[in-house]
Amino acid sequence: AHTYRYEAGGVAVFGGIQPQPLPQQADGTLKLDDIAAAIKPDDEHFARTRLLALENTWNGKVLALDYLDAATGLAHARGLATHLD
């Protein structure tokens, strides 16, 4: 997502956020299993996972509403906020 690659590290500099990019599928989605696996445990040795950021459109392609519902549903079930860029 451009929020990771092209924003001059703004999320880290201004927000104190440690982004963790995940591999994207050819259609711009993230595998739900990859999202779930990337959520850090409640352990002082890890940066706390608090947010799922998705990008829509992705290279001009609109992500399917059912995918967005599933991804944000997973995030909310795990206590994460969501951001759609």
Task: State the predicted function of each range.
Residues 1-5:
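Conserved PLP-anchoring active-site segment centered on the Schiff-base-forming lysine
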Residues 6-18:
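Active-site-proximal loop->helix
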Residues 15-57, 62-70:
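PLP-dependent aminotransferase-class I/II
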Residues 63-85:
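Catalytic PLP-binding core of fold-type I/II PLP enzymes
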